[in-house]
């Protein structure tokens, strides 16, 4: 489900669980719960350190999430200081993103919005969803797949990623020509 647009993920869930609800019925019932529980979202271990490190070294960073803008705002409300360090934030319901992951649209849009002349080959994507790794590859960007072992898949995604780790704490920026952690 990770890396899919909200409607597609919800429709898969409803079908798999054989629930007699439409997307809109489910969405209306789930909105209140999402606001409560998504508001308690924690950052991945190592994420804050990496974001602050890149910011201190003036390395441009963008965020491209399949989440809707509304859900992104709820999930990140407790971390505004960190998410304020991104030069570009692109959500899955952004009108400039025509196709959701695994299409490369969201990454290319986020890169363009940095407005600093980057080419896809200059970018490194951190991705926790298989669709996102595939999207990064389609965009011709390197990717670090931060696999959440709770959602382990059996697809070919590992061979698509430039690197495969299970925690951002394992990431070594020097491997990608970036400054070492202090």
PLM ranges: what are they?
Residues 2-6, 26-30, 68, 82:
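Hydrophobic/aromatic residues within well-ordered alpha-helical segments
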Residues 11-52, 57:
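Metal-dependent phosphoesterase signature
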Residues 43, 61-64, 125:
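Conserved SAM-binding loop
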